[in-house]
Amino acid sequence: VLFDRGLVAPGVDAGYVDSENAFGGKAFPGTVGQYNPGSQPFLKVNRHGERFMNESQEYDNASHASFQQPGHVYAMIHDANFREDVDRFHTIGCSALTRYIPGMMEGQLEQYEGEGLIMKADTIEELADKMGFTGADKDNFVATVARYNELYDKQNDEDFGKPASRLSAIRTAPFYGCWLGASLL
């Protein structure tokens, strides 16, 4: 099964590729580990700063959607209220571990921030810079976050149909972002 929680270093491509050196002839270059919170339905955008899917879907569907994006990666964005959001999302299966294991997400945020895999910023613009968005892609990113906040306020995802209970505001600093790609579990 392809999972949607492979943590990827900024600027690195990921995805399912042929590799004669890997078991079964396939590999997932770029992913550096499983980041369980990556399966939470937070805002996800491509390298152009554009939202491209309903983030509240099965693991493999999110992975397959990423294969159509530049570098086969996407950024996941959330704010300081992630704990309340995760509790409200009430995901099931192994993604629920983020909710059930006390301190899991907080510990992983701290660990991976220290390794340069999760970015933390006081503003959305600063987060965009840290994540590598520049020029029009940065403008798109900032506009996408603003649009996502509008959808949250309406409690209606007019763009991709995500259930209202899975929407979250991105307004309270610090803001967090990381790059994800498909990984084999």
Predicted regions and their residues:
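A glycine-rich dinucleotide-binding beta-alpha-beta segment and adjacent secondary-structure elements
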Residues: 139-185
